[in-house]
């Protein structure tokens, strides 16, 4: 059991930290800037407080808040410390006691208590590869441009029909056209940079070519799978785990004699990735003979549209995961099941789920 539990509450410009000695119950609190220098100051505080307890008995824990938690997590990992980034929802709903009000100091103390209580569930944070981080930034920037383009286009559509003539309207339309062209050019530059990042590593290049061989998977979906799975290392090539993160894996509820709920997808997922995958599914249904045949079988079996399309998304994840595992490109005769995929990880072909 770790003797020192360190709870970190991350924010944009600072972080609050509570250091707790679980043996005697003493603790201390401090606040530092969310920078590598702040991380260094925190380590000095822990060393002073621990009084001879080695770093092997320290457990850093914080909420996985995405960008805000990355700076300190990276610093501690590079220095060889054990830091556990946990889902904020899990920490919040583990407290038991009813808390009224909120402040950063209390939050960091609650995280330290959580780290001590659930130490057996702790898993060490692993730094994503440099390529995965770069792809993630490029994808985020591309999405921002796509959203901006959508806003500009929708503004033009709002012009009443009676006002679509005249010098002012002509100027607005010309301006909109120029902006959209500029955005499209920037999107092309970002996509070219993504391909350059992938080309720098042979393993990434191989995965990218395999993913693009699947009819329906374009550059954005291929880059998403590589970036968010760190080239499929993050989820251990487990199709079920990937589908869960993408928000298309069904989960049911079964308890006693009265609770028997139809499996449905959870809203705890990355909704943007799910939307991007929906685009791939729509394309595959039209152009991919394997997926088209599968989709038509579901429709013929009487499944509703939502169930059919969600199963298609699951099928795509199963197939591309098997393709990556085998190192094979897609063709119409590709078989996605193999001995390395246990039956418990596979989805029923026509499961009633959303």
Question: For each predicted feature, which ranges?
Answer:
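Gly/Thr-rich phosphate-binding beta-strand-loop-beta motif of the actin/hexokinase/Hsp70
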Residues: 2-21, 111
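Short, glycine/acidic-enriched loop or turn micro-motifs at the edges of active sites
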Residues: 12, 66, 90
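Short, solvent-exposed helix-loop connector elements
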Residues: 49-50, 124-137, 164, 168, ...
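Long, charge-rich intrinsically disordered scaffolds of nucleic-acid metabolism proteins
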Residues: 84-210, 214
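Low-complexity, acidic/Ser/Thr- and charged residue-rich accessory regions of DNA metabolism proteins
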Residues: 257-258, 295-354
